[in-house]
Amino acid sequence: MKIRKLRGIAEINDYIESYLAKWDLYACIDTDFAYDPTIDTVFWSVVVSEENDKAFKEFFKKLGCNVETDVFVYSIFHEIGHSQTLEILSDMDYNYSQDRKADPNISNEEYFNLPDEIIASQWAVEYINNNIDEVKTFWSGLQVLLKKFYKRNHIL
């Protein structure tokens, strides 16, 4: 069986990375959203998990996010939030969060409320609420590339 590369990933990554440059961050596709502070990289994904995505959007609303947008946007800004809040998190809170994340049975509710996760989400909500036009412009440009990606790869 021949495996082909998905076309358009580099273009999406470049777009995200150019946006992340304002925080001196890099972008890389992966199987899930994440932030790696050792390489200043935000990992992003096109994988959809309807249950988790719905729960994450609801969590952002509970935190006071006034902008209705795609979970991709919330996820990107949440990961940026990790980069912006890492230094204010105590070692004890960080270690506790990492220990709890090792539990494969952790619920979304507990995960979202871990010290490192909630502070990153709070940062994201504040940034999104205070920069609505910028966030909408970012998402509009990204949507064009994502739709092109789906079409080129016969995903939708």
What are the language-model segments listed below?
Residues 70, 86-118:
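Post-HEXXH active-site segment of zinc metalloproteases
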Residues 8, 12, 73, 116:
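Hydrophobic (often cysteine-bearing) scaffold residues that line and stabilize catalytic clefts
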Residues 2-3, 15, 38-42, 47, ...:
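Active-site-proximal or metal-binding-adjacent scaffold patches in catalytic folds
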Residues 7-24:
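Zn2+-dependent metallopeptidase catalytic core
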Residues 76:
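A conserved beta-strand element that flanks and buttresses the S-adenosyl-L-methionine
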Residues 103-156:
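Long, well-structured alpha-helical subdomains associated
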